[in-house]
Amino acid sequence: MKVLGRMFKDVNRQDMKIEVETQDKARYMGLLLLADEQESMIARYLTRGDLFVMRADDGRVVCVAVVTDEGGGVCELKNLAVAPCFQRRGYGKYMVGYLCRLYACRFGTMMVGTGDSVTTVSFYRSCGFGYSHSVAGFFTDNYDHIIVEDGKVLTDMLYFRKSLC
């Protein structure tokens, strides 16, 4: 793993760091499945994407993210998952900000696709993303099971975009 940067301290005063995992990406599948419930869907982008791992100094994995190059000056945040014990403490938002700064030198736009749930839509809006478009029936057409978020069955993929320049 290559260390890319040091970060802030969390409420427990533990130092955090973000690294790029280039070898055994599949070992993070358990955490990646928190954000994308089907392993075969994750496999479609994990091998071609950059996998970022945020760790506490004691080695615990706090957060993971996968970013892909979609061509035409666009990258996509394909997966963002925060370990349950670290959720709702700002780590996901920090990771998104970090990735936006990191990729700003290579891409003009970052996209993210998500389901139509209040929690995730408001999260990405708070990170500076604005609505772009939707893909009707994405979840029902591509997943082998029903996906429910915030008590709502997901059908369409909503895409949000953020200018990085």
Question: What is each of the regions a protein language model found here?
Answer:
Residues L4-M41:
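Short amphipathic alpha-helix that is part of the acyltransferase structural core
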Residues A26-D57, V61-V64:
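Active-site rim helix/loop that mediates acceptor-substrate recognition in acyltransferases
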Residues V53, R60-D69, G73-A81:
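Conserved beta-strand in the GNAT
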Residues L80-Q87, G115:
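A short, internal acetyl-CoA/4′-phosphopantetheine-binding micro-motif in the GNAT/acyltransferase core
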Residues F86, G90-Y98:
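Conserved acetyl-CoA pyrophosphate-binding loop and the N-cap/start of the following alpha-helix
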Residues Y103-D116:
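Conserved GNAT acetyl-CoA-binding A-motif
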Residues M111-G113, R125, G130-G151:
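Conserved catalytic-core motifs of GNAT/GCN5-like acyltransferases
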